[in-house]
A protein has these predicted regions:
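Signature of N-terminal electron-transfer/Fe-S-associated modules in redox systems
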Residues: 1-171
Length: 171
């Protein structure tokens, strides 16, 4: 089904801190749009002061992390065709910032905690003399972690960090 010309309703969190509330928007969709395209169009046409963090629009930087209909996703990689299909007919698409992190404004959160925790992790220094082998299987196993783009969606979905008031103690 083509989305071109479809009018879609959105609810986007606007404001700062506790005073933030969902604001309603309607937008005409184009074929091939991603959620970030919609946010940019709302920003350009209706809300020029809307705060949103993004950088590459290619799924490489992780800056545009948000919750779309309650699911943590990258806005630049989430196709509107998928979101429209998942959203019950007549319901708006809801876009909120990540819940785990302190809310700054609109769709922007403070993710500095992640970097602070990383700084507290002591480096592992191996023995002076290399008396071990690093085989290809081990290299393949750790490669997955090198692919991290620091979008922090994994941290956002962790129920311990998300729901525990003292989540800093777990780091």
């Amino acid at each position: 089904m083509s989305l071109k010309g479809t009018i879609q309703s959105f609810k986007v969190l606007r404001g700062e801190g506790e005073e933030a509330d969902l604001a309603s928007y309607e937008l005409e969709l184009d074929e091939g749009m991603v959620v970030l395209d919609c946010v940019h169009r709302i920003q350009y046409e209706q809300e020029p002061d809307m705060a949103v963090r993004w950088n590459c629009k290619a799924g490489k930087c992780g800056s545009c992390s948000a919750e779309i209909n309650g699911r943590p996703r990258l806005m630049c990689m989430t196709r509107m065709s998928d979101v429209v299909a998942e959203t019950p007919a007549g319901q708006p698409i809801e876009i909120r910032p990540m819940k785990t992190f302190p809310h700054i404004k609109d769709l922007v959160t403070d993710v500095a905690w992640n970097y602070e925790v990383a700084q507290r992790i002591a480096p592992i220094n191996g023995p002076e003399a290399m008396d071990w082998e690093f085989n290809q299987m081990e290299a393949d196993r750790v490669q997955h972690f090198r692919e991290c783009i620091e979008c922090f969606l994994c941290v956002n979905t962790c129920h311990v960090l998300r729901d525990h008031a003292l989540f800093d103690d777990f780091a």
